[in-house]
Regions:
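Generic hydrophobic/packing signal
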Residues: 15, 80, 88, 118, ...
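N-terminal secretory/targeting leader peptides
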Residues: 8, 24-113, 139-362
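Absolute protein N-terminus
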Residues: 1, 23-24
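Bacterial N-terminal signal peptides that target proteins for export
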Residues: 1-8
Length: 362
């Protein structure tokens, strides 16, 4: 009888150990410091992954000192990271087709619509999927910044004030906008903006108002002009390493995708809504001149943006596909609102419910 009790206890312990052993932990790399919206998103994702998998999967979130953005490709291919935040425009040579959506940056007026349009675009874009396969990753969604504005160290009230200004540009569409109005675009990593403004190397930046806090531009910028300059939406929030994805069961892939789908709008919510609100308060407190553009300035800027977008749409069917998705998701966001969980539920129905996770990303 004692032997039976001992054996039963041993079996129970073995079963318990097996259950623990089967629970999987994935190294998750937002490639961003704690204050960054990507880190916020990954914190939410860790919660969602536990919920969606019933505790069978977990995320071990690591900082940029372990995996940085430029290291993401190698990290995913070597297994240093199981899932990571990769920006296709950092690897432009690897993502020419995916990057087409980025060339329509000036179309961005609704952050959530841009993030979901990007997600649906890549999921259904065969050449984009091939690019991710060659990259060694699986795409599970995108997000978006707020609408970019102009932050400068010189007053800008009229179009003439742009003449000769050196403006940091985060991509080709912003450079085209600057050049059209007589400014000189300067390609510069966002992390170098503060130093460049401080030293007078540049006169301003076309970027998220959140950079006022993220990169302490609030300490050097003197003027903000709220001319809408589009969004940064070519993200791949949860890029799963190909080997990691292949080792998952179909059920695990589905659960992982559900967690990622819930995490995607958290990036947009933090980057495009929460942080701008905090940055706006900091701008006001610092006494920075904060202006809306004149009707003339706004009309000219919007006209150029429309012309720029249409030129890309007419030249590339993929650009036309993306433009159509922007319109679709602008309508959905207007209907659903900006609550991240409500949008994620709708996105699952619109985008992911038709995906075969037996073959997706394989």
């Amino acid at each position: 009888m004692k032997l039976w009790k001992l054996t039963g206890a041993s079996v129970a312990a073995a079963l318990s150990f097996t259950a623990v052993a089967q629970a999987q932990s994935f190294v998750a790399a937002p490639a961003a410091p704690p204050a960054h919206p990507a880190a916020y998103m990954y914190g939410k994702f860790a919660e969602f992954l536990g919920e969606e998998s019933g505790g069978e999967m977990s995320a071990n979130v690591v900082g940029p000192e372990v995996v940085s953005l430029p290291q993401m490709k190698d990290a995913l291919q070597t297994g240093l990271a199981s899932v990571g935040n990769s920006l296709p425009l950092y690897f432009a040579a690897d993502f020419p087709e995916t990057g087409v959506a980025g060339d329509l940056a000036l179309a961005g007026r609704n952050p959530h619509a841009m993030g979901w349009a990007m997600t649906e675009f890549v999921v259904n874009c065969a050449p984009c999927q091939e690019e991710y396969k060659n990259f060694g990753g699986v795409f599970l969604g995108a997000g978006s910044s707020d609408v970019y504005v102009l932050m400068t160290t010189k007053p800008v009230e009229t179009i003439d004030d742009l003449q000769g200004l050196r403006l940091r540009s985060g991509g080709a569409p912003y450079s085209r906008w600057a050049e059209n109005f007589g400014a000189t675009p300067v390609n510069l990593p966002v992390g170098q903006t503060f130093e460049a403004l401080s030293q007078g190397t540049i006169d301003g930046t076309m970027a998220s108002i959140a950079d006022m806090l993220s990169y302490r531009l609030v300490d050097v910028a003197t003027n903000v002009l709220r001319v809408p300059l589009g969004t940064y939406h070519v993200t791949s929030n949860f890029t799963v390493g190909a080997d990691t994805w292949a080792d998952m069961s179909v059920e695990q892939r589905t659960q992982f995708a559900k967690a990622a789908n819930r995490g995607d709008p958290q990036l947009t919510d933090r980057w495009a809504y929460q942080m701008p609100e905090e940055a706006n308060a900091a701008v006001a407190e610092a006494g920075i001149t904060d202006m809306e553009p004149s009707e003339e300035f706004l009309a000219a800027s919007n006209a150029f943006a429309e012309q720029d977008v249409q030129a890309r749409v007419e030249a590339n069917p993929l650009a036309a596909d993306f433009e159509a998705l922007i319109g679709k998701w602008e309508g959905i966001v207007e209907e659903v609102g900006t609550d991240p969980e409500a949008l994620a539920a709708r996105a699952w129905d619109e985008i992911w419910s038709g995906v075969d996770f037996n073959t997706y990303g394989m």
